[in-house]
């Protein structure tokens, strides 16, 4: 549904150039919720603004629903008629709600329909339906100043849906909201994704957003995508930075002759007593150094850091036992020396891409 190829954006800043995007290749499948995460300055907002050409890419292509938007951009600063028509299929929600304070909630949602030339009766009906969809039918005659932050963002979402888009872009839409309101907005985005078949591309710096709502995710750093894949693939990939951030676990070896292993549980394996089985089967004492578990996409997923007695060479069989139970097991690098070994799955998911940034 959304594909960027070799996307580059360079800004001119006085006497120097600033590269915000450096050859970004991104593919968002139809009907999925895709999260792009990274620290401030990573290039996330530049990326999402290039997707609908609010920012003109310096080079590369952007394709949405099979149409190359960069080919429609034209040469002037004003968007071509073809690009404006293509943009009606792309809705966008911003961090700051950008509502007109002098207009009612209903009038704010009607605004894009006015611009599209929809008749008064039809746009009022459409705006009312959208407010009902986002749970604000009773606020149609209210003004933005009378709404909470979460309600304002719901109005922004309703407005973004006015043109019946196929794609919804969300630029840090929950970063100014409290945790409870954030959860309600994320649930709304997921509901809209499922009810309307929307493809959602969201930008965030919060790992909880990815964990709560995303099917796939990408990590950006210095204008490049350094890791991407479905959330399930990322969690199943030893050494994944995103997996580590989604489910952080800590703890170091208590002595030199100890082996520390990160174990990832997914699905049925998350509810089985595998660690106690390991202890009984091999008659070894296992220390749990840290653990994190949550539900992602309706599946229970977790990571646990355990310590086994003895060096790695003495624990090859117990670690193999963990793999036989359908778990991912990775030996953690010794902080005092190079990593002894890493136990990896027999086959890395083909759809997962990972790039080392030099």
UniProtKB/Swiss-Prot annotation:
It is found in: Cell membrane. Signal peptide: none annotated. This is Methionine import ATP-binding protein MetN. The gene is metN. Belongs to the ABC transporter superfamily. Methionine importer (TC 3.A.1.24) family. One of its GO terms (cellular component) is plasma membrane. GO terms for molecular function: ABC-type D-methionine transporter activity; ATP binding; ATP hydrolysis activity. SMART domains: AAA (SM00382), NIL (SM00930). Keywords: Amino-acid transport, ATP-binding, Cell membrane, Membrane, Nucleotide-binding, Translocase, Transport.
């Amino acid at each position: 549904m959304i594909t960027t190829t070799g996307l580059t954006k360079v800004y001119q800043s006085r006497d120097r150039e600033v590269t915000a995007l450096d050859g970004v290749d991104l593919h968002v499948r139809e009907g999925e919720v895709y999260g792009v995460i990274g620290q401030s300055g990573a290039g996330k907002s530049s990326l999402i603004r290039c997707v609908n050409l609010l920012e003109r890419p310096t080079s590369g292509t952007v394709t949405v629903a099979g149409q190359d938007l960069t080919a429609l951009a034209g040469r002037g600063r004003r968007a071509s008629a073809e690009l404006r028509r293509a943009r009606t299929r792309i809705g966008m929600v911003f961090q700051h709600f950008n509502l007109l304070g002098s207009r009612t909630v209903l009038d704010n949602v009607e605004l894009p329909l006015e611009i599209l030339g929809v008749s008064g009766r039809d746009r009022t009906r459409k705006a009312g339906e959208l407010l009902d969809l986002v749970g604000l039918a009773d606020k149609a005659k209210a003004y933005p100043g009378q709404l909470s932050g979460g309600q304002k963002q719901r109005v922004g979402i309703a407005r973004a849906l006015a043109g019946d888009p196929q794609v919804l872009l969300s630029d840090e839409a929950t970063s100014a909201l409290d945790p409870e309101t954030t959860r309600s907005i994320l649930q709304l985005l997921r509901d809209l994704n499922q009810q309307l078949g929307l493809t959602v591309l969201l930008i965030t710096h919060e790992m909880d957003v990815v964990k709560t709502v995303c099917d796939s995710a990408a990590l950006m750093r210095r204008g490049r995508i350094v890791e991407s894949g479905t959330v399930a693939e990322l969690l199943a990939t030893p050494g994944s930075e995103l997996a580590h951030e989604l489910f952080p676990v800590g703890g170091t070896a208590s002595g030199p002759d100890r082996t520390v292993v990160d174990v990832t549980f997914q699905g049925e394996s998350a509810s089985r007593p595998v660690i106690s089985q390991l202890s009984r089967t091999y008659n070894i004492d296992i220390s749990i150094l840290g653990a994190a578990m949550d539900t992602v996409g309706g599946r229970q997923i977790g990571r646990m850091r355990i310590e086994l007695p003895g060096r790695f060479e003495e624990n090859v069989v117990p670690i193999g036992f963990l793999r036989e139970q359908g778990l991912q097991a990775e030996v953690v690098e010794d902080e005092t020396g190079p990593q002894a070994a890493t136990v990896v799955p027999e086959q890395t998911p083909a759809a997962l891409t990972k790039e080392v940034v030099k």
